[in-house]
Amino acid sequence: MLRSDSPVDARLSICAIYQDEAPYLREWVAFHRLIGVERFFLYDHESTDTHREELAPFVHDGTVLIQDWPVNPGQREAYDHCVAEHGHESRWIAFIDIDEFLFSPSDESIAEILSEYDHLPGVGVPWAVFGSSGHKTRPPGLVIESYTLRSARPRNSRWFKSIVDPRGVVRAMGPHAFSYRDRNYAGPVPEFVPFERLRINHYWTKSEEELRQKLMRPRADTGAAYAPTAERALTITSAETSVFDDAILRYLPALRETLAATAGSAA
């Protein structure tokens, strides 16, 4: 049961489940710290790579908590566990993946944006889906600088993720939506934040090489294999990701500085 009578420690936290994402974890955590995320509740789904070494600086300073999670498929269960065990520690929790980067294109404080929705138990944040940007193999740069071609605005109701008030949540319905104690809402979320103010850059494919590696793993939400082949996924994303977008690059200089600093403190 969520301990709703306890004071919160953070305004905004992130919950995510991952498997063998070591090459991307430091960038992802460091970026979200820059935009105001204070805590990370991360569920390790039987990784065999160097993820703990990559996360060591953030674990050491108390920013990241790693939970071993050998549950299959595990994503929805991890989200429910996070709400029950850590919901009292944060006013808002964003439930996103390691290939998703939350930020404000209008350069507003995310905490201030969310304060406008304090009367709601959750909000939906739209995706901007990025493709390979022509990369056949993993490029040497960071994720946010390597991929700059995205799709147009979200085309259907599943192109979003949720940021919730844990006290208003009953359970996760899947990777995108939750059921809420107050059921007086039509649709998957109580309200969507405008795309121009808050969004998630979703680097789903990355390079062709990385996409092929990704599709070899089972889905975190169902445990099933990914439906599209790599060729089919690349064909779809290449055709649909033609909008140049570098709004997130305003964070690049600060992100590089942060990564340089944490590299020296890695265990």
List where the protein language model places each region.
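Active-site nucleotide-sugar/metal-binding loop of Leloir-type enzymes
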Residues: 80-92
